[in-house]
């Protein structure tokens, strides 16, 4: 059951773990699109909502914080197009604030942390938040040596050659600067230059660009620096990384020093001493925003004193001494021409509004997500009303559309004054528009609440689900078959020729054999050719042996993301052991079921989804045919020669004082142990810290070896 609409307080620990798994996967996907490909597909507001949901879950269930948690990372992994650069100091992101109350809370938290009274004034800087690409530029002995993108905050992309083409960035600094200087700032494209570039593209009959931010990022990632040079990119300096000697002791003075060294700095930056002044400057910048020749999406506030910044320090991914006050998303009015239903891999029916084209924030918008059936009716994910009942969205309505840097914006509200009498309420389909199967809304057995998503029950007989499943199967983190992308999958799926048809995963691996005796050769079809077909067959054959976690992930089991697949592979070791365990766990009781639930990071929601998947004969039959073609490799185990805990199952409970829970888990796994989240007959060791409760009691009841943290350290160190 989906819990994404449920209040955090109502979730069980298993439901929270399942949702954190989903959020980690979903946020990582959007990070990769935004930071790695410059192709965001959701709005900033929706992205921020995902992050806030993740933070709320982690605050309530701190023991569930994952190693791949979005709260522990910045941006996306660097691409492989450019060589990697490890930042001398991490490039962290900023926490966001969205209201005056949020800003007041931020300032109050600074005063509290420093033990300052309100009458002991602390100065802040306030400057526009440029909507561009973050950059770190390193100078040694005054000469530009390296320029790198933010990447994941630790490692970025080397774009030095392209940065040298930006006229505003000096290649040589004045005499007397520190030996090592890292200037950080934002590369952007001016609005006027963006419009001129699009006029040029139109004149040449080429596709125009979406927005200045994406265009700047794409221009900076050109393999040919001449292309970058032609794009007239610009730069604002506002921060620093490694600095061998600090030329000033305040944020404001540091930025003014950058200006003296020849860097452009934003003229709207101010030093202010009160919340009222900060908010007034925010409003002032907001009023100037339409007339600026560059895009901004908020105002950044920083504690001015570098000494106080040092005392305030950092959280895991952001400084305590800074925040970004975001502007509201841009809005416009247009008409809903049609509501269409898309069917995804898991059968979810997602409504999309086709809009009368409208320009919002410099981008032509023709589609808007409607999320689900309830959203159309004005009901939020938690069952709360987000619009008056009569403000349901209908075909023919005039609506308010919001866009915040996304490709598919969202509809906020209906303009009732413009609703025509003949406009009728939208009837959400109860039958899948693709396969004709029933589409149902499940009820969460624990909360009794209806799931906000309606799903097709057709499974693999539904073409939409089948094609999306195949696309998932060949995706990068699954089988990763080069040359078999979305368009190719659609071609093979729709083809009626038995020698070309691919409708299940095993048929990918029989394609070459079927083609040998066919009169219809793939190489003779437009879009393929002999060379590309040869490469496709080679890519397919390269995947006849595959890592176990990739195989499990590729199966497309609901709730089983890449991280969960790795946990399962590490726990079971072989596919045979995994499949046997799933079958033995079918009664939802017994040792196999308990062992599955005991795996750290696997809760009842995920476990139930896996067991249900293996109960379906069609799934078992398809996997059987797949195993005739493919061999999942045994999961790699850490080298643990001489380890006293190799092969043992360990449970940590209570408070740990010398390690964080993640550190203890990582250390145990590096020594060959399996870390479980609950105690069962197969548990070998329970490490109990202060506050240990029911897990320790159960361990004693079962006769499992127990020890405190010091005894555990002595064991693994001996």
Swiss-Prot record:
Gene3D superfamilies: 5' to 3' exonuclease, C-terminal subdomain, 6.20.10.30, BRCT domain, DNA ligase/mRNA capping enzyme, Helix hairpin bin, Nucleic acid-binding proteins. The keyword Zinc-finger does not apply. The active site is at residue 129. Its EC number is 6.5.1.2. The keyword DNA damage applies. Keywords: DNA damage, DNA repair, DNA replication, Ligase, Magnesium, Manganese, Metal-binding, NAD, Zinc. Zn(2+) binds at residues 432, 435, 456, 462. Coiled coil: none annotated. InterPro entries: BRCT_dom, BRCT_dom_sf, DisA/LigA_HHH, DNA_ligase, DNA_ligase_AS, DNA_ligase_CS, DNAligase_adenylation, DNAligase_N. It comes from the Bacteria. One of its GO terms (biological process) is DNA replication. This is DNA ligase. It comes from Rhizobium etli (strain ATCC 51251 / DSM 11541 / JCM 21823 / NBRC 15573 / CFN 42).
């Amino acid at each position: 059951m989906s819990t994404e609409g449920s209040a955090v307080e109502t979730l069980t620990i298993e439901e929270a773990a399942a949702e954190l798994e989903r959020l980690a996967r979903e946020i990582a996907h959007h990070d990769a699109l935004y930071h790695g490909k410059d192709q965001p597909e959701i709005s900033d507001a929706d992205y921020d909502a995902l992050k806030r949901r993740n933070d709320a879950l982690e605050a309530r269930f701190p023991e569930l914080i994952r190693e791949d948690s979005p709260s522990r990372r910045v941006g996306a992994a660097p691409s492989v197009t450019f060589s990697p650069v490890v930042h001398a100091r991490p490039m962290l992101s900023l926490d966001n604030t969205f209201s005056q109350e949020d800003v007041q809370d931020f300032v109050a938290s600074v005063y509290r942390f420093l033990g300052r009274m309100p009458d002991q004034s602390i100065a802040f800087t306030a400057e526009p938040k440029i909507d561009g690409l973050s950059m770190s530029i390193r100078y040694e002995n005054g000469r530009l040596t390296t320029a790198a993108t933010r990447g994941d905050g630790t490692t970025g992309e080397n774009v030095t050659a392209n940065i040298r083409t930006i006229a505003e960035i000096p290649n040589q600094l004045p005499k007397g600067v520190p030996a090592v200087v890292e200037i950080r700032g934002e590369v952007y494209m001016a609005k006027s230059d963006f419009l001129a570039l699009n006029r040029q593209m139109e004149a040449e009959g080429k596709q125009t660009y979406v927005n200045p931010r994406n265009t700047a990022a794409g221009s900076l990632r050109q393999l040919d620096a001449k292309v970058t040079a032609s794009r007239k990119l610009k730069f604002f300096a506002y921060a620093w990384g490694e600095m061998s000697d600090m030329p000033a002791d305040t944020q404001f003075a540091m930025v003014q020093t950058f200006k003296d060294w020849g860097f452009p700095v934003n003229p709207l930056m101010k030093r202010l001493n009160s919340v009222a002044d900060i908010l007034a400057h925010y409003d002032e910048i907001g009023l100037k925003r339409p007339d600026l020749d560059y895009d901004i999406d908020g105002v950044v506030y920083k504690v001015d004193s570098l000494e106080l910044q040092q005392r305030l320090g950092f959280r895991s991914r952001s400084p305590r001494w800074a925040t970004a006050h975001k502007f509201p998303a841009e809005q416009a009015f247009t008409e809903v021409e049609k509501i269409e239903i898309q069917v995804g891999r898991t059968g979810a029916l997602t409504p999309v509004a086709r809009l009368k084209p409208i320009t919002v924030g410099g981008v032509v918008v023709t589609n808007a997500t409607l999320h689900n059936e309830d959203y159309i009716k004005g009901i939020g994910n938690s069952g709360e009303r987000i619009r008056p009942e009569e403000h349901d969205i209908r075909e023919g309505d005039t609506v308010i559309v919001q866009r915040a840097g996304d490709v598919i914006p969202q509809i906020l509200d209906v303009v009732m004054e413009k609703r025509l009498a003949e406009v009728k309420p939208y009837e959400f389909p109860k039958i899948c528009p693709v396969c004709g199967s029933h589409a149902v809304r499940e009820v969460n057995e624990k909360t009794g609440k209806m799931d906000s998503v309606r799903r097709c029950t057709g499974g693999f007989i539904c073409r939409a689900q089948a094609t999306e499943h195949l696309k998932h199967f060949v995706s990068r983190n699954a089988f990763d078959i080069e040359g078999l992308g979305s368009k190719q999958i659609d071609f093979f799926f729709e083809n009626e020729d038995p020698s070309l048809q691919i409708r299940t995963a095993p048929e990918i691996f029989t394609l070459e054999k079927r083609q040998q005796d066919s009169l219809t050769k793939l190489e003779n079809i437009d879009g393929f050719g002999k060379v590309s077909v040869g490469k496709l067959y080679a890519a397919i054959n390269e995947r006849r042996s595959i890592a176990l976690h990739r195989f499990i992930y590729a199966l497309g089991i609901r709730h089983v993301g890449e991280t969960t697949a790795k946990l399962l592979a590490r726990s079971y070791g072989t596919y045979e052991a995994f499949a046997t365990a799933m079958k033995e766990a079918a009664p939802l009781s017994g040792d196999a079921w308990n062992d599955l639930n005991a795996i750290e990071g696997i809760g009842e929601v995920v476990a139930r989804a896996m067991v249900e998947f293996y109960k379906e004969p069609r799934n078992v039959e398809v996997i059987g045919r797949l195993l005739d073609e493919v061999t999942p490799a045994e999961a790699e185990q850490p080298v643990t020669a001489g380890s006293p805990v190799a092969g043992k199952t360990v449970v940590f409970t209570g408070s740990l004082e010398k390690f964080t829970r993640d550190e203890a888990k990582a250390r145990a796994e590096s020594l060959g142990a399996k870390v479980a989240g609950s105690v069962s007959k197969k548990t070998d060791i329970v490490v109990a810290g202060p506050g240990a409760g029911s897990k320790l009691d159960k361990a004693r009841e079962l006769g499992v070896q127990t020890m405190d943290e010091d005894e555990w350290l002595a064991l693994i160190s001996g």
